[in-house]
Curated annotation (Swiss-Prot):
Record keywords: Cell outer membrane, Membrane, Signal
Native species: Hahella chejuensis (strain KCTC 2396)
Signal peptide, first to last residue: 1-30
UniProt GO cellular component terms: cell outer membrane; transporter complex
Name of the protein in question: LPS-assembly protein LptD
Family indicated by similarity: Belongs to the LptD family.
Record GO biological process: Gram-negative-bacterium-type cell outer membrane assembly; lipopolysaccharide transport
Record function comment: Together with LptE, is involved in the assembly of lipopolysaccharide (LPS) at the surface of the outer membrane.
InterPro entries found in the cross-reference section: LipoPS_assembly_LptD, LptD, LptD_C, OstA-like_N
HAMAP family (UniProt xref): LPS_assembly_LptD (MF_01411)
Subcellular location field: Cell outer membrane
Amino acid sequence: MKEGRKRLRAGYCYMLAGVVGVASTGSSRADSEPQSAAMLDWRMREFLTPQQMTTLEPQCRGTYVEPEYGFVNAPSTTSTPDNEALRARSDTLVSPSESAMRLQGNVKAQQGAWWLEADQVELDRQTNVVDLQGLKAARAPGLLLHGDTARYNLDTKDFSLSDASYLIHQRHARGDAERISSADAQLVRIEDGSYTTCDPTHNDWSIAASEIILDREQGEGAAKHMTLRIKDVPVMYFPYLRFPIDDRRKSGFLYPTIGTSNTGRGMSFGIPYYFNLAPNYDATYSPLYMHGRGLLSELEGRWLTEDTYSEVRLGYIAHDSEFSKENPDESGRRWALDFTNRYDVSENWRSTIDYNVVSDKDYLNDLNRTLEIQQETHIKRSWDVAYLGGGFSFKSHVQGYQTVDDDIVDNDRPYMLLPQLSFGWERDFDPVAFGLESEFTYFWRDDENLDPARDQQVVGARWRTQPSLTLPLSTTWGYLTPKLRLDHTDYQLEQRVTGLDESISRTVPFYSLDAGMYFDRTLSLFGDEYNQSLEPRLFYVYSPEQDQDDIPDFDTSVATFSYSQLYKEDRFVGGDRVGDNNRLTLGVTSRFNDRATGAERLRASVGQIFYYEDQQVGLGTEGLSDESESPWAGELVWRPNDRFDFKVEGLWDWQERQTEKGATTLAFHDPEYRKLLNLSHRYTHNDLEQTDVSVLFPVTDSVSVLGRWFFDLVNHRTIGTMAGVEYNDCCWRFQVIARSFLKDADDTENSELDHGVFLRFQLRGLGNIGSRFEDVMAKEMRNFNERETYRAERYQW
């Protein structure tokens, strides 16, 4: 108490001096009577500076501008109030008694970070209580309070404000309250209060509660009898609700999810609940009622330590009514599990587990909302242990599958890897470089329904070793890289057809030469300076033919020919076939690089392979060829700026004068991602031709339309559509889309279209009500998620 009175005595001296002092508020409205705290700092668009306009969205009518305030030459406003004396000025100073002091007329006071403006301030020296009448403004960095009367106890720090309004500048949040009180700086109580992020001229939505408790120490708030109002019309009521007031996680209900069921024309509705179990692990339970199916429950759990991250997702429905109708022999019980774990054992060692399983092949299409499992015929599950460091690499890989489609014959199902051990080593012995890659794999699969007479039951081990020796030679104008690689493989097989070897060895040497030159020049185009390069390249590879027909196919396929295959040593992917090669690739690339930024604006590449011998090694008939030349392979990439991306790649058969394969994509967005345009065309001769168009376009500052059309030109049918509308206000946003998509994406000819409607109602600074909109739109439209990220970072959505 004595220390407090000592600060008071010092404060009185500042007050007396302040009666004739000079103050600066930086606001021409300081002497007017605002109706609320928000109106005091509100500025319409036409009165903003160009700098202030940079953070204002086009549809917003204005924003809040926090003025400069404080006495000239006063202590920093970041000071702690308890350590600062009270400075004040007013028109008059009255001391009616020794225990009282009254400041009247244009009272301005400052203590540390707090700045006060009022009509009258009265200080009781005995009780250390300050009464304020006509409080025009109580400011702290990023915060503004306004009210009728206020009382503050200098000893206990108790504070109360009646007929109050508040403004939080950074969050664009404002509200009113009958009374605001605080027992200390960490606990604030608001009685009959409201909250909104809408501007003070348009109260589109708000939250009202009989009591709101804000616990800054715990980082959470609690509201009693809370009502969400749209245009002053109550639309949702919660008798009690807890919510976070900072970035710390808190348990509680999340905002509802609303969508359509893919059964009939019904809706789906759910209210997730978040469990903040500990600082390093949490869980989310999401019950979702789906019309025509029933109650789907999804549970997501996360666990994080310094070295480990684990995530588990589980979906379960006790009885799917629609599924039971379509599959009378099934119980209707459906489920799915997705588990991932990453463990950084040390700086060099890491373990990764990925386990997925579903009850049936249609689960992911019918029910999946949160599981991160790809819609595939064979669902992978794996465990990896890897080491990387000092030029060495090691990986232990165990991989299995769940074949979700029972119609797939057993011989077409993949082998399990139990395990696959890989080792790599690289070392430079100037001027040569030595490399070694080695891999051991045991392949196994269930052979119960396989035909032993056709060698379908074969399982066994494969050990492949590939040492290499490279002599890299380079200058500023080119390079020459001869390379020798030996590919040796041993097999120990089981359950082979009688007469076929169970022990097989294969050794194939590879000789390759990679050479290129670099020419460049400076040129000017359309007023910009570019550095153009011309890069011819030669690649030769030779490997002799070796009969491999007795070797089973565990994991091997023929790589799809494209531009990227021009400079590869082998045409096979996997270890059961090693190709015979005697071929030369000739290619050339030209680049245009912006001299000011170094960015690549244009790249054009083309090349062709010349075969000097027929390709005799194959998988059945795949991989065999008697052609002397490959099609021309090329690609063109044009990025004139950061907003436009154009790419063409394809294969051209010059002898037949036809395109074998082609793909064209164009993507455009404006600087603020308000306009999006995506075009693509895919073509494979006598097999596939599809076009895909998606667009998002602002009709007005507030309204945007979006759509997509996916069309199959071979089957002359639409295989996907999306149409929607988005309304943006400064404090809320509504999005709705209707989409159709193939039930079986692999069957573009016969698969039926499924339909769905997705919507989201977003309240700025509060949350979303609706479906998992971003997940849907990420698949439908390129750059849509980048648009959402841009809005969140720039406009704090």
